[in-house]
Amino acid sequence: MNLHEYQGKQLFAEYGLPVSKGFAVDTPEQAAEACDKIGGNEWVVKAQVHAGGRGKAGGVKLVRSKEDAKAFAAQWLGKNLVTYQTDANGQPVSKILVESCTDIAKELYLGAVVDRSSRRIVFMASTEGGVDIEKVAHETPEKILKATIDPLVGAQPFQGRELAFQLGLEGKQVQQFAKIFVGLAKLFKDHDLALLEVNPLVIKADGDLHCLDAKINIDANAMYRQPKLKTFHDPSQDDAREAHAAKFELNYVALEGNIGCMVNGAGLAMGTMDIVNLHGGKPANFLDVGGGATKERVTEAFKIILSDSNVAAVLVNIFGGIVRCDMIAEGIIGAVKEVGVKVPVVVRLEGNNAELGAKVLAESGLNIIAATSLTDAAQQVVKAAEGK
């Protein structure tokens, strides 16, 4: 689950980290009031969406009057912001962050992720702040500094100081960086984060360090023990199909192809997508119906897949273990009838009662193509999607 910038900064402040004074508002009038509360004669207004690239898309602006802040809020609230990280429809803006202006002398980068290879939290720092860190890592990997956190003792101040020296910081900046480093590490662990970024972490004109941005992603599998963070969830930022799928415990991720995929098991689902791609097709989604491929779940899965207008054919790939394939076939037939599927459906059943399941499908009289193997299924669905 992603957090908005203002929510991330709220957590930063709770851990004593330096952030700008600001207010998240949802009306133009509140934007003007926020300027009064903050004081000064310059403010930064930022549209709040779960996507990067807001500045280039016009979603971040320096304003010098309350009227300009009010106008910016009126321009974006209720609208969609399109950036290079969103689709063509963009993300809806329901909050504007109004905060004090910061005089920037230099921009740095500081972030942390869970590194699966080392099974540790790894911090990354760079002098190349304010830009796409993936691009820096690809083009100039030597500019990415790393510090691995030992889970037994946690982040240590000396690790922060070492990074600070490598970044060229000096004097009080070293101590400030070490404090930010340790604070972020504690925040990461306490809240079960999967990713954390401060980009940029800036050196202000007076020499002090300041967290100018906040990007936080929480491990969805740990949300049950983060009740406070559940209240931070903004459903308007979710993909509508993915949100609907979650209600039925279906794991769905929208893609850009035209072949809908419905599979039981994440590994089999990924393998199915690979073999479809191998035979010249493009998957429209990842969808794992889980171990219990019941009629209700299959029906909802069909509804979700077919809500994508790009889908020209559907591949159902089910391995029957505890659940018998003939029962799964009955569920597929019932779902196809209920939903009124108009596109070709290719079904590959394997496992418990697979032959009986194929017979049930063949006798249904519906536009369902029974595949004899995974390769056959991929070839059949690619042909069907091409209208052959």
UniProtKB/Swiss-Prot annotation:
Binding site for substrate: N264, G321, I322, V323
Source species, domain of life: Bacteria
Cofactor dependence: Mg(2+)
Enzyme Commission number: 6.2.1.5
Ranges for domain ATP-grasp: 9-244
Gene Ontology MF annotations: ATP binding; magnesium ion binding; succinate-CoA ligase (ADP-forming) activity; succinate-CoA ligase (GDP-forming) activity
One protein family per Pfam: ATP-grasp_2
GO BP term, example: tricarboxylic acid cycle
Cofactor, free-text remark: Binds 1 Mg(2+) ion per subunit.
Residues the record lists as binding Mg(2+): N199, D213
Cleaved signal peptide residues: none
InterPro entries: ATP-grasp, ATP-grasp_succ-CoA_synth-type, ATP_grasp_subdomain_1, Succ-CoA_synthase_bsu_CS, SUCC_ACL_C, Succ_CoA_ligase-like_bsu, Succinyl-CoA_synth-like
The protein's assembly and partners: Heterotetramer of two alpha and two beta subunits.
Record HAMAP family: Succ_CoA_beta
Family according to the record: Belongs to the succinate/malate CoA ligase beta subunit family.
Protein name per the record: Succinate--CoA ligase [ADP-forming] subunit beta
